[in-house]
Amino acid sequence: VDDAAGACLGIPALTALHAVLMDGGVTDQTVLVAGGAGAVGHYAIQMALQLGARQVIASVSTPAKAELARSAGADAVVLYKSEPLVQRVAELTQGRGVDRIIEVDLGVNADANAQMLRAGGQCVAYGSSISPMQLPFFPLISRNLQLKFFIVYNLSQADRAQAHSVLDRMLGRGVLQHNIAQRSTLDDIVSAHEQVEQGRLSGNLVLQIPHQT
């Protein structure tokens, strides 16, 4: 793994991998990855497929991001700003719903998630743009839906070791794409920060620092 790819891994890759691995993993499951072109989502698509998911659906906001999700291997992509997400997921799963949702923004998507999960399904949330938030309690409890939360900084030693071991094997086999949208130098650091802050890039911006001799 080169330095640029290594810079992309860190928190996003471990977050994606734990979201896929937790509670027994996703073998033979249908998984919806919210934000499938994001730093975490792009890895989560690939990792879910590598670890046995039967079908991976991604939700994204733009056609350009849809292409990124497809390049990561998503079996289907829904553009949630122009398509009815709940209806499309129902169609893609023949009305059954998904087994697991890997969720980047629970506060925004909680109501839709309760409709898209199968009975007994699980939403694994690692982020929310809204806090505090309202949850659809009765739709959740009436269908035995599960909400799981985690932040990668507070993983147990066992969970962290498991994720590191699986990630090492994936990297050794060269099966992961690393979504690098732009490479910049320290001379362009102001512009680089502005682009990240303004969300102009679909992917990671990597700063290349010359090696000192």
Task: Describe the residue ranges of each PLM region.
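Local beta-strand N-terminus motif with an aromatic residue
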Residues: 28, 74, 97-98, 140, ...
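NAD(P)H cofactor-binding loop motif with strongest signal on the N-terminal glycine-rich segment
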Residues: 35-36, 105, 128
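Glycine-rich phosphate-binding loop and adjacent beta-alpha segment
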Residues: 60, 108-175, 209-213
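Short amphipathic alpha-helix with an adjacent loop that forms part of the alpha/beta core around
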Residues: 84-95
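C-terminal capping/lid region of NAD(P)-dependent oxidoreductase domains
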Residues: 95, 172-182, 190-213
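N-terminal Rossmann-like NAD(P) cofactor-binding module of classical short-chain dehydrogenase/reductase
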Residues: 99-102, 124
